[in-house]
């Protein structure tokens, strides 16, 4: 530091002022920074000005030694007080004072330094930051849930996101992570009963929470609300679930017809964000759930005239289409496979087909996309889109040939059994029952085989209807879309329909990575709360992946989670002189891969602020 003299003249009078100046190094080179105005000081030789500046520097840095000078000590003290009142302490001075006050500058027994209580921190840190970004704590508070319920809902949701476990195992997982450090909550006494009770409290407010969350995500990510994608899946129970009236046996997408199940209906937008979900009885047909879901959507996000509902062929019946139109909405659906028979000639005719231009995946630029060709046919006010897929053609042919091969084997077995005329399954009623089962089991190919049984002669025979098989071969790789929107080209209609994979991807994620199935709860409310908890965790997951996608990063949450598992929190134990032990609780230094992900996700890499604790060696040993 040094003292600079400045003068200015006003109305014929000259005013002199002395300023304490510090030289600082900036990216553009050394610069002078005014620290404080010292006022009008006594005139003195230049050497004494330098000595005074040195004394001020020494006094401000806390040094006791002062240089001898003609300047009175009272003047120095006055100048020090003036400078201190005019500026905050520098980081160096502040650090020096803290060191002096807390005696952190200590001698450490290096051979006794150790780390303890290491906890996985990276994934829970990201999950909690997105919990805050989505404003979930405030949303739960607006729903009337207490602070304790909000805290437990947070950790239960993060468990589903990171390492799904039952409520019985969840407390141990929570204690194995850095959640206690991040949330500043003691989970040492947390038991599963508290988590079960929390599900009961959460269940009553799920509609209000889902409504507020959908609006928050819409504004946060600028989401499109013109297209709704709806699909249904099933999830099965372990046990009989006698106390749940919705637990029924039905068509199982999980290939568990032996278990009771419930149906889950989920509506998402074109970016894959959930808008509404409902839980239905396990024996209901998909088509019977659409009207209830439209009502739920109207409650959660509000339906507006002109929006488009996209559903798969299982819900594309005329009754459902009338319900969609009655709400002044548009529809885009896949027609049942049987409807293709009316369009065989159009599928055979290559004219008017145009190829859909498909971009390669950023994560796999060398992947070969299947060829998709589409064309439009107008029937009244409806637009029919005929689609041909090269990949699906090969798949359909392989499935059909495999089914036909197995059907022929079973037909030969039935023929031999009937010809033998003895034993089980040879009575006329039993033979007819066997024929019915074969037609049901091999419905894809049985329709072009004639199966006949003469109860008088007790002869069973079958024959191939070649015309029907040729017709089926011509439809390999084809499917049919239908919409009441006249403004869509064939290409646009196909692209909107394929967005339905967003709902299918959500179901796959809910069932496996987020641990939605199987369900061990039996009470209806807890089952629905369990499913809602999985949906909440999916909100976090899709928000994380959407943020990365917006940053140009095409990766999954599973990859992010595995990468960040090595970012931890631990306690460094530093035995010091005098029988004292310093414990420093802090996060490990993030690696380059960690910092890159945190930057892309726009969250801090500092998980917690370092926390220091002093204790005696005797206390530390306990």
Enumerate the language-model features and the residues they cover:
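Acidic, glycine-enriched active-site microenvironments
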Residues: 25-27, 45, 51-52, 59, ...
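Conserved, well-folded catalytic cores of nucleic-acid-processing
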Residues: 44, 59-63, 86, 173, ...
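Charge-rich, solvent-exposed alpha-helical interaction surfaces
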Residues: 55, 75, 79-82, 410, ...
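Compositionally biased amphipathic helical and low-complexity segments enriched in hydrophobic
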Residues: 39, 57, 61, 67-68, ...
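Short, flexible loop/hinge motifs at secondary-structure junctions
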Residues: 71-98
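Short, surface-exposed polybasic/aromatic micro-patch for ligand or macromolecular engagement
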Residues: 4-59
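Anion-binding and metal-coordination hotspots
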Residues: 2-5, 15-17, 27, 91-97, ...
């Amino acid at each position: 530091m040094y003292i600079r003299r400045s003068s200015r003249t006003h109305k014929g009078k000259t005013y002199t002022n002395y300023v304490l100046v510090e030289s600082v190094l900036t990216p553009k080179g050394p610069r002078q920074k005014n620290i404080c105005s010292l006022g009008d000081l006594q005139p003195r030789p230049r050497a004494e000005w330098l000595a005074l500046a040195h004394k001020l520097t020494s006094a401000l840095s806390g040094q006791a030694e002062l240089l001898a000078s003609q300047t009175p000590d009272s003047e120095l003290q006055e100048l020090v007080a003036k400078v201190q009142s005019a500026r905050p302490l520098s980081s160096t001075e502040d650090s020096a004072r803290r060191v002096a006050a807390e005696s952190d500058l200590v001698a450490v027994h290096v051979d006794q330094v150790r780390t303890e209580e290491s906890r996985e921190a990276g994934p829970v840190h990201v999950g909690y930051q997105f919990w805050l970004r989505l404003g979930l704590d405030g949303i739960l508070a607006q729903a009337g849930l207490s602070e304790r319920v909000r805290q437990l809902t947070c950790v239960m949701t993060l468990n589903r996101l990171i390492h799904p476990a039952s409520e019985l195992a969840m407390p141990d997982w929570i204690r194995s992570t850095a959640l206690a450090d991040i949330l500043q909550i003691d989970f040492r006494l947390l038991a599963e009963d508290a988590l079960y009770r929390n599900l009961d409290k959460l269940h009553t407010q799920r509609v209000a929470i889902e409504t507020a969350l959908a609006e928050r995500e819409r504004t946060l990510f600028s989401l499109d609300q013109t297209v709704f994608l709806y699909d249904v899946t099933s999830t099965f129970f372990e046990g009989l679930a006698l106390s749940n009236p919705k637990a029924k046996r039905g068509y199982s997408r999980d290939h568990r017809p032996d278990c009771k199940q419930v149906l889950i209906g989920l509506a998402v937008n074109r970016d894959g964000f959930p808008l509404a979900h409902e839980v239905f009885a396990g024996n209901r047909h998909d088509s019977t759930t659409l009207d209830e879901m439209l009502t739920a959507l109207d409650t959660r996000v509000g339906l507006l005239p002109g929006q488009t509902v996209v559903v798969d062929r299982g819900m594309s019946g005329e009754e459902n289409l009338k319900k969609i139109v009655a709400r002044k909405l548009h529809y885009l659906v896949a027609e049942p496979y049987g409807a293709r028979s009316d369009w065989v000639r159009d599928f055979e005719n290559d004219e008017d087909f145009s190829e859909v231009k498909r971009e390669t995946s950023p994560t796999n630029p060398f992947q070969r996309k299947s060829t998709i060709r589409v064309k439009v046919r107008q029937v009244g006010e409806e637009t029919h889109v005929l689609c041909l897929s090269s990949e699906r053609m090969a798949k359909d042919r392989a499935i059909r040939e495999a089914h036909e091969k197995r059907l022929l084997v079973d037909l030969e077995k039935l023929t031999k059994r009937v010809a033998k005329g003895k034993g089980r399954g040879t009575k006329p009623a039993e033979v007819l029952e066997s024929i019915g089962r074969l037609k049901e089991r091999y419905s894809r190919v049985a329709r072009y085989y004639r199966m006949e049984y003469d109860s008088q002669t007790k002869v069973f025979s079958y024959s191939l209807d070649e015309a029907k098989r040729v017709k089926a071969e011509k439809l390999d790789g084809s499917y049919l879309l239908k919409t009441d929107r006249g403004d869509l080209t064939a290409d646009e209609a196909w692209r909107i329909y394929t967005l339905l994979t967003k709902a299918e991807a959500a179901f796959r994620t809910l069932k496996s990575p987020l641990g939605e199935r199987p369900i061990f709860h039996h009470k209806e409310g807890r089952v629905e709360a369990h499913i809602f908890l999985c949906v909440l965790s999916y909100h976090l997951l899709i928000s994380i992946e959407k943020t990365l996608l917006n940053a140009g990063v095409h990766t999954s949450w599973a990859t992010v989670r595995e990468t960040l598992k090595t970012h931890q929190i631990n306690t460094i134990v530093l035995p010091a002189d005098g029988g004292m032990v310093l414990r420093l609780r802090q996060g490990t230094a993030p690696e380059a891969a960690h910092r890159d992900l945190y930057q892309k996700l726009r969250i801090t890499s500092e998980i917690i602020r370092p926390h220091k604790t002093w204790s005696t060696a005797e206390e530390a040993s306990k």
